UniProtKB/Swiss-Prot annotation:
GO biological process: proton motive force-driven plasma membrane ATP synthesis
Free-text function comment from the UniProt entry: Key component of the proton channel; it plays a direct role in the translocation of protons across the membrane.
Keywords: ATP synthesis, Cell inner membrane, Cell membrane, CF(0), Hydrogen ion transport, Ion transport, Membrane, Transmembrane, Transmembrane helix, Transport
InterPro entries membership: ATP_syn_F0_a_bact/chloroplast, ATP_synth_F0_asu, ATP_synth_F0_asu_AS, F0_ATP_A_sf
Keyword check for Methyltransferase: no
Protein name in UniProt: ATP synthase subunit a
GO CC annotations, alphabetized: plasma membrane; proton-transporting ATP synthase complex
Lineage: superkingdom: Bacteria
Length: 245
């Protein structure tokens, strides 16, 4: 039986049976039938539920005359991403704002939840950054195809010089697959290292001093979230551009 956080144990207590049955039907390996939900999955679920509550509370408290704290936070995040999207994507950026905002809030929340005692940052486990990277990868390719069509989108991979197009096509395909690993490793490595440093100083130095490293962890969390959504916007801009038409 693996070590379980209290929220993981709570979920496994009530959902282990249905989850194990579903994994069996899908032929997914399940080494721990009595605890099929891992810590990072439980933390993702918790973050999702907390964000749902946050946005419901924000929606209920919306006001033109006297916007509350939650509304200011939500509008601030949306305006920041909108400004970044307008600069990097240009015309039509509004179509992708909701995805980038959702992605950024989700990643940032997962980065920060590890600072709360009894919780772990899901992004410190490689499967979670990989999932975010794969969703982003498929998202920008789908919208690239939608904007340019199959032929128009393939031109992005061929370059302007026809006689080296086959070589450029192979290079571009490899570079696009490499983006998955780049997004994954960058987020995972930084959050894993940040968690380890914070835990190490909590155990070695007097109480109070680790607050400095908690501040550093928050800074790293913000930076990594910003880098991830910025790269997502850049990839979207490249995929939806019509420069080779």
């Amino acid at each position: 039986m693996p070590h379980q956080l209290w929220f993981t144990a709570f979920l496994n207590q009530y959902l282990a049976g249905p989850v194990s049955a579903m994994m069996s039907v899908l032929h997914v390996p399940n080494p721990h039938p009595r605890a099929p939900i891992s810590n990072y999955v439980a933390m993702e679920i918790l973050v999702f539920l907390l964000l749902v509550l946050f946005f419901i509370a924000t929606r209920i408290s919306l006001s033109w005359d006297k916007p509350g704290v939650l509304q200011h936070i939500a509008e601030g995040m949306n305006n920041f991403v909108s400004n970044q999207g307008e600069e990097m994507i240009g015309h039509g950026y509004e179509t992708y704002t909701s995805y980038i905002v959702t992605l950024g809030v989700f990643i940032l929340s997962m980065n920060l939840i590890g600072l709360i005692p009894g919780f772990e940052a899901p992004t410190a486990f490689p499967s979670v950054p990989l999932g975010c990277a794969l969703v982003t990868w498929f998202f920008y390719h789908v919208h690239g195809l939608r904007e340019n069509g199959v032929i128009g989108y393939l031109k992005h991979f061929l370059g302007p010089v026809w006689w080296i197009s086959p070589l450029l096509f192979v290079i571009e395909i490899c570079s696009h697959f490499a983006r998955i690993m780049s997004l994954t490793i960058r987020l995972y490595a930084n959050m894993f290292a940040g968690d380890m440093v914070t835990l190490a100083f909590f155990s070695l130095v007097p109480l109070g001093f680790p607050v400095v490293f908690m501040g550093l962890h928050i800074f790293v969390s913000l930076i990594q979230t910003y880098i991830f959504i910025t790269l997502a916007a850049v990839y979207l801009a490249e995929a939806t551009a019509h420069g080779h038409d």
